[in-house]
Amino acid sequence: MKYSVAFVALAAVAAQAQSLADVPKCAIPCLDKAIASETSCDKTDLACVCKGFSAVRSKATSCVIDECGTDVAINEVLPATENLCKNPPKESEAKSTAEEEKPTTTAAATSTLVVVTTSAEVVETTAAATTTVAPIIPTTAAEEPATSTPAAATPTKGPEQANGAAGLKGLGALAMAAFAALAL
């Protein structure tokens, strides 16, 4: 789950998978194990495996990252497995694809990595400064010193921040995911 923010960010730009052959070979053993432990489906029955999609991807995530690396997991494995479960081939198509590949490579297309969306609120605070100025010209009547207080800034958030640091919030999430990957 630590890697989910990065997966969501990069999944939209990845190529669509058309068959089990589009899943990187390094992910196949991890996905095979996850399918076997989390479903009672045959590895080539994508319609069945996609029904238990969440459990399979949760089980396979850390193994895929360990075996393939974060970059391959995000840019290749995740999009390939998500697209296969969006439009899984009919059982006969899955079997014909499986016959063309090694038997250990057919289960990879049935799961994806964990996707969790998180958000954080930025709070901005300001302090008001008070300045006291003594009169410069002496007068005969007693006057009190003039006091001015600048108006306090109002914290802002939301879509009105169209540029600056607000435009980099996706990059921050990606950096957070990269640090989480290094922590393991």
UniProtKB/Swiss-Prot annotation:
Q: Its GO CC terms?
A: cell septum; cytoplasm; external side of plasma membrane; extracellular region; fungal-type cell wall
Domain CFEM: start-end pairs = 18-112
* Disulphide connectivity of cysteines: C26-C68, C30-C63, C41-C48, C50-C85
What the entry lists under InterPro entries is as follows:
CFEM_domain, Extracellular_membr_CFEM_dom
Main subcellular location: secreted
What are the Basic and acidic residues biased-composition ranges?
A: 88-103
- GO function terms (MF aspect): metal ion binding
Q: Which domain of life is it from?
A: Eukaryota
Region: Disordered, residue numbers: 83-106, 136-163
Q: Which UniProt keywords apply?
A: Cell membrane, Cell wall, Cytoplasm, Disulfide bond, Glycoprotein, GPI-anchor, Heme, Iron, Lipoprotein, Membrane, Metal-binding, Secreted, Signal
For the lipid attachment GPI-anchor amidated asparagine, which residues are annotated? N163
Q: What does this protein do?
A: Suppresses host programmed cell death during infection by binding to Z.mays WAK17 isoform 2 and Z.mays LRR5, to prevent activation of Z.mays WAK17 isoform 1 and the downstream hypersensitive response.
Protein name per its UniProtKB record: Effector CFEM1
Q: What is the protein's species of origin?
A: Gibberella zeae (strain ATCC MYA-4620 / CBS 123657 / FGSC 9075 / NRRL 31084 / PH-1) (Wheat head blight fungus)
